Amino acid sequence: MSGLAGGLAYFIPAAEIAINATSQVIRVTPSPTLLFSPTPSASSFPTASPVTGAFTVLLLGSDDDSKFSPDHVLTQSMILVRVVPSTKEVTMLSIPRDLYAHLSTGGYAKIDGAYSYGGPGAAIATVEQDFGVHIDDYIWVGLLGLVKVIDAIGGIDVVTSNPVMDDYYPADLNTSWPYGFQRVAVLAGPQHLDGVHAMQYVRSRHGDLQSDLGRSQRQQQVLLAIRQKAKQLSPADLPAMSAAIGGELKTSIGLSKVGALLPLAASLDNPEQIHQIVLLPPYTHGGGPDGSVVGNWNLILQLVHQYFP
């Protein structure tokens, strides 16, 4: 575990942008249902009471290129975020995409398949039943969603400590042939990344000496960089960003809650109050069916109940 500000970096900006970009309100319980309404203007954020109670959000990221059927994609990134406004604490739990788990749709498989079988409702129900937590909302972003978010804020700046050299990066933004590979190289030192290069930086799974831990750290680094740029946004900027992003994000967070989260977001900037949990050994180990990761659920649940009471 380590205290990293990256955990919250994407959460609030994504909520603000997603509700404008998709105009979708999705009821999490008992079953997600899409409700459509016109894209709101910056002045349409309703006045809301401050958020005082703790809440938990599931962040989901997917490869949604043309190899996959719409809404039947895997979730390569699953991050559980708990925010406690009274103490200004944020806790993140990165869930291994290959974790062997009991899916809410039935049977056992890698946990990243829950979304493909039943959408956000199945992903939420799976995490709730296996980890013993309650999830209030979710945010989902696809490949183009991440690219468009970063491009809409003018790119991001990162300092790369571990260079990335990946000869087997999937060339899945190539709509004519999304099955090929390409070389991705990110050198050490300061880098300004546009949306495509930032996506490559966080998704690359090969050539990092720290393996999956390095990938998780890169994801958090990019989230922090997004947060730094998004902090400069005001509600007046959101309609233009919505037009740029299109419908590449989905969320269950309604307008009233977004309005209440705006002042809260500004107060959650203390890195010492933001914690990241990564389920490395002894919490998990390899050797599961179909290349999955096996969880030591006794240890996992003890940890989860400590940070997600």
Regions found by a protein language model. Name each.
Residues 1-309:
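Non-catalytic, solvent-exposed segments at the cell envelope interface
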